[in-house]
Design a protein with these regions (language model features):
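Conserved acidic carboxylate
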Residues: 27
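Conserved phosphotransfer cores of two-component systems
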Residues: 62-64, 87-93, 104
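A Lys-centered signature of the CheY-like receiver
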Residues: 117
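Two-component/phosphorelay signaling modules centered on CheY-like receiver
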Residues: 30-49
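Conserved phosphotransfer microenvironments
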Residues: 71-89
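Non-catalytic signal-transmission and effector/linker regions of two-component phosphorelay proteins
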Residues: 1-22, 55, 120-138
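Acidic, metal-coordinating helix/loop segments flanking the phosphotransfer/catalytic sites
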Residues: 50-68
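Hydrophobic/aromatic residues positioned on beta-strands within the core alpha/beta folds
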Residues: 98-99
């Protein structure tokens, strides 16, 4: 995540904007995963992960079905997240893809959004907020 100079930066603590949202985070970069997880927790989300592999992500999904998934499409050792996208789509879990690549080809309807790294906090939240807002019990 990159910070911007916008006056609309998120609060640093105590926010409940995403309270109760169960979010699966799949990211093989420790630094990126930690930054995203910290932001989501500050905003009140319950975050599983970051999972660095598809196998880890599948275990987290089985342990606790997420409301939303945030996934880096290319993981360690060239592992592609497409099989994970299929599983999440079968369970009607909205997916946000984050990637360092300028071009990503995914079948239509698999993801809510594709964000290119580095992603600003504002860009990230502009996509995530409406997804969380339409979850049941919101």
């Amino acid at each position: 995540m990159k910070a911007t100079s916008s006056p609309h930066t998120p609060p640093t603590s105590g926010s409940s904007e995403l309270k109760g949202a169960r979010i699966l985070l799949v990211e093989d970069s420790w630094h990126v995963g930690t930054a995203i997880k910290r932001l989501l927790r500050i905003l009140g989300a319950d975050v599983s992960g970051p999972a660095a592999t598809i196998a880890d992500a599948k275990r987290l999904i089985a342990d606790r079905k997420p409301d939303v998934a945030i996934i880096d499409i290319n993981l360690r050792d060239g592992e592609q997240a497409n099989p994970l996208l299929d599983r999440l789509q079968e369970q009607d879990i909205p997916v946000i893809v984050i990637t360092g690549y300028t071009s990503v080809s995914l079948p239509p309807g698999k993801v809510e959004a594709i964000l290119q790294k580095p992603v600003s906090v504002e860009q990230f939240l502009a996509i995530l907020r409406p997804i969380v807002a339409r979850l049941p019990d919101r």
